[in-house]
Regions:
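N-terminal loops that bind phosphate or other acidic moieties
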Residues: 1-157
Length: 157
């Protein structure tokens, strides 16, 4: 019964057809991509991963990039943060999957066409704000814990 198979109805039921007629198997798209790029190996020695998407909302926890990246980072004890275009209803649900914080590119009231016209500028501004926050966090860590920034790659056990 294909009605109970997660993902079988995606792409107009293409997954179901492949499973039934070609003995195919289903695998999460983001998991496939992360495997193809050897993501877990690339996390070795990494302190923080920056990911993102255009609009983060309740749907973001259903097999999208941020969820997959967050899950893998969390499994390796690595901080994951995100730059997103906008945050909608349920956006903070992504925090349960390893994304620790997110910042929007939108820095004021604007229409979608305005945001798209200034996408590069808005993205760079968000990236600057994000890395300033990370730097502030590192300084705070040094002040509170005496952790030298040169030792940041060492993880507490």
């Amino acid at each position: 019964d294909m009605d109970n198979v997660k993902g079988a109805g995606a792409a107009g039921g293409l997954g179901s057809a492949l499973m039934v007629f070609l003995n195919g198997t289903l695998k999460s798209g983001i998991e496939t991509v992360l495997d193809l790029v050897d993501f877990d190996r690339r996390l070795e020695g990494v302190d923080v991963v920056v990911t993102g998407e255009g609009a983060t909302d309740w749907q973001s926890v259903f097999g999208k990039v941020m969820q997959g990246v967050g899950i893998h980072c969390k499994a390796h004890g690595i901080s994951a943060v995100a730059i997103v275009g906008s945050m909608g209803k349920g956006a903070e649900d992504i925090f349960e999957y390893g994304i620790e914080s997110m910042i929007t590119t939108i820095n004021g009231v604007m229409t979608l066409p305005e945001a798209l016209d200034h996408a590069e500028e808005l993205y760079l501004g968000a990236a600057r704000r994000l890395f300033r926050m990370l730097r502030a966090g590192r300084k705070l860590s040094v002040a509170v814990n005496g952790v030298n920034s040169n030792d940041s790659h060492k993880r507490a056990e």
